[in-house]
Amino acid sequence: MISGDDAAVAPLLVGASAGGTAVELRVLGPVEAVVGGRPVDLGPPKQRALLTLLASRVGRPVAVDVLLEALWAGTPPPAALASLRAYVANLRRVLEPDRAPRAPATVLRTYAAGYLLDSHHVEVDVHRFIGHATAGRDAWRGGDPQRALSEFEAGLA
């Protein structure tokens, strides 16, 4: 629940919905993921890069051709599409460990000709930081330095 003090942050918070798998992505610093309160292994560098790219666009689909070009610096090898699909499958297993076989993915979803991280199931630290920084700036401008300090500290926590 968002209190009145947190209302300014609400549009920028992206978090797990009730009953959904709670996935926290940390991209400020080394890329990490926490699922159900536990850190998880994100796999090899390209797989981590895929997750980072999708995390930068939470809730928005990213086309397969954009992913291929980004992951292989504009020159994807012939097996790139198969590798991308394997990375997606691996990340789905890691991000949704309790998902039944053949059940639709809810965190890393296929969308049209691409993939997206569902904003109802993923929280990204940079969004939380931006929300607190914005609320802190607004509090400072509004003449409330105590609240501003509290927001800035929360953003850095």
Residue spans for each PLM region:
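Intrinsically disordered, low-complexity protein-interaction/activation regions
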Residues: M1-A157
